[in-house]
Amino acid sequence: MTTHHLVVQSPGLSIDQAEQLAALAQAQGVARISNTAARLLDVQHDADTRDEVAAWADSRGVDAAFVPAGLKLSDCKVLAMDMDSTLINIECIDEIAGVAGVKDKVSEITEAAMRGEIKDFAESLRRRVALLKGVPAGALEQVYADKLRLNPGAERLITTAQSAGLKVLLVSGGFTFFTERLRDLLKLDSAHANTLEIENGLLTGKVLGDILDADAKAVHLREFARAHGAAQDQIIAMGDGANDLKMLAAAGFPVAYHAKPLVRQQTRFALNVSGLDGVLNWFES
């Protein structure tokens, strides 16, 4: 049986918390990774132990992940990320809607779609984009400059992954206006999203071409992985919403990042309180 470690982390992780989890998982030792993370060595990882650890950690705001011992970041070849509310702090379409004065209407649809309550993502996107008809195209730049920020740990995760030889893919059900700028800013290898139609400096309320939905996200990831010779167990994928589930299922290391309950329930790994760079603590140097 493969030896597993339990990596625990949170912004306020205490020695006492690490020791309690070590006892719960019958760890053979504790190695401090940083002041916010620890690796509990050679733990029990049967289903009952996993459930007990998950319940304990969730109730105390601690991220916990069972990982094979000796795992190295360089063993992976691809890092794939969603954009809105994963790589960045906002849902871009909601902020564009704010400029148009229809944020409440658009946000309601966005939230329902991300929770998985609206099964047809393409239709939900068309409904939301239609509400943006007549918005000046300059609103996109306004959102990018004033509202959009990288989520904590984004730059460290990406630069460390790139240094370890991973190729980085950004694939989003959002818009190319933002993904292309983030691709250039972070020197990503590839980025895909939907393109808003603009005529005479105004949004028309339409998306050009096919909608990049959950199925398309998974296809882009598989094609990118194939191009870079990555097997499924060499792929890290991160997302937060229901439209990320198929992409996450295509990865050996699927990560629900500050995600909706539906996504956390169906994903092997989760970061609920840590930054994006919390992923790095799962790998040994």
Model regions: which residues?
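Exposed alpha-helical structural elements
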Residues: 20, 48, 52, 105-108, ...
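Residue-level marker of motif borders
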Residues: 77-79, 111, 235
